[in-house]
């Protein structure tokens, strides 16, 4: 991938977790902790950047994303559906499973919108094109289908003024932007605002947005997190990573000015793992801009 057109930034590893597929970072501001998931190990991570300590909650099934709730527990989107998880005991309860009939699908990336609802998308274990969907779990605990015909549902972000939703279906190499009404529902079919060049031989994965409205996109197989202007489609910056499978990112820290980055080691050959010993770890980059506060589930 050629990112020579932008000033490269650097990241450093803060937790050499060795996760097969670390994903879904979420800054839990009330606890000053980073929530993240180790999808294939079926567990939720809670990382304290101040002490460097990390603990896990076993979920019992592949978990794609996790967010805190207004009541202080956790909401996870998993292969078994939407689960409420008590962070101390690990006790789990099923809320709803909108794809219970799709045995080969699991939930992947997800986030809460500014209205306190969880958006989470699915993917087929064999990456069957169009076999997945994007769902929204409303605060009444009912699921609503937001987009069908998805292949690998991934990054989500909302603009600070609540006018725009950004969404990634990874194999398309595109970020779609949807106009929203005052209730946060899409009012158009979406337009392409960012496109990852096919020549880079990577796909867009997780995504976050900063206080200036710019998108930060993790490049799976691209060894980088890249910053883009959704208005012009222009790439503005790049965080160089020491591992190829960069999965997602979010802003955290007391001032939301640290970019936390997740990575993976799955699908890497032994010689690649030798060259990428920190693959599967959590990283932090100082990128010179702050992010927006993450939202909790209001239900």
Where are the predicted features?
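A short beta-strand motif characteristic of beta-propeller blades
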Residues: 10-16, 52-58, 93-100, 142-148, ...
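Beta-rich, blade/repeat-based domains predominating
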Residues: 17-31, 60-75, 101-117, 146-164, ...
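Conserved beta-strand positions in repeat-built beta-propeller and related beta-rich domains
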Residues: 28-29, 34-40, 75-80, 118-128, ...
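A short loop-to-beta-strand structural motif that recurs across blades of beta-propeller domains
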Residues: 43-45, 81-83, 132-135, 174-176, ...
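Hydrophobic alpha-helical segments and helix pairs
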Residues: 91-146
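Loop/turn-rich, solvent-exposed surfaces of beta-rich toroidal or solenoidal domains
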Residues: 174, 178, 195-234
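Short loop/turn segments immediately following beta-strands, especially the blade-tip
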Residues: 178-186, 287-292
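Blade-level signature of beta-propeller repeat domains, shared across WD40, Kelch, NHL, RCC1
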Residues: 250-299
